[in-house]
Amino acid sequence: MSNIISKEQDEAIKYFRNKLNLSDKDLYIPLINFELLRDKNEQYANILYELYKNDPYLFIRALKEGYVVNQPIAFDEAIVRFFNGEELAIVHKTTGRRYNVNVKMKQLPDGFSLQTMDMWLWSELV
């Protein structure tokens, strides 16, 4: 599943799902009446609107197909955890490609090396 959204966006979706009993379909089919959502909770509606405005395809795919929440890790902490053998997720800063990595892997992703570790965003496995 490659529909990755922020924790803040996840909270907004959960609010409308749980508090208002809106289904995912209710959130994306009208494409979308954000004013109706703003009447219920302006802050969360604005978060979802920004997601929709920035990437409408991700917004629809995330609600239709499911999504995972990005949980970033600071570079210094990630390096320590990586070399302690923990499996983590990395996303290349330029290409956006995402991989799960650990220090014991026989073959690491292309472009991933000691010299290029700062070219990747690190996060928890999702």
UniProtKB/Swiss-Prot annotation:
Q: Which domain of life is it from?
A: Bacteria
Q: Any idea what this protein is called?
A: SPbeta prophage-derived uncharacterized protein YorC
Q: Which organism is the protein's source?
A: Bacillus subtilis (strain 168)
The organism's taxonomy opens as: Bacteria, Bacillati, Bacillota, Bacilli, Bacillales
The gene designation is: yorC
